[in-house]
């Protein structure tokens, strides 16, 4: 079955071509081990085809549902990102150290950009999503404060005697 994120580039003329993709819940659920479950993201792709390579410029904007790290409730996180990828025609055995350079074999006629879309969207989300100050579930915030372990004010003078002997070595 052909994916909505596959681009048949074999018949494309040399030049720039524009594409639009709608990334939604079904996209995220179709990917194994996806960290994102729900979201709506609009993606624009400018694909410049040349004789020996294709240069892709992705832009995305939208929002995703994630779990707030403070109160464990759902928070809407905005996604706004760009990604540039170079698809170079050549042997797949060629090694590259550049994450934005992808080798494409000469006999390939379609380009599946779903991995690049997921990577761009995932990297645009915060590692620790939080509600704005004052928007968290108050009941949960109170419970966290109630059970939070208080830090003891341990002075530097309370050093283990074995370690204090090392201070005299200077």
Model region roles, listed by residue range:
Residues 78-81:
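Short Cys/His-rich "knuckle" micro-motifs
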Residues 1-10, 14, 40, 89-170:
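Charge-rich, low-complexity linker and terminal segments
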Residues 1-67:
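A positional/architectural concept
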Residues 75:
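Cys/His-rich microdomains that often coordinate metals
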Residues 28, 87-89:
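Aromatic-residue hotspot detector
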Residues 70:
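Short, cysteine/histidine-rich loop/knuckle motifs that typically chelate Zn2+
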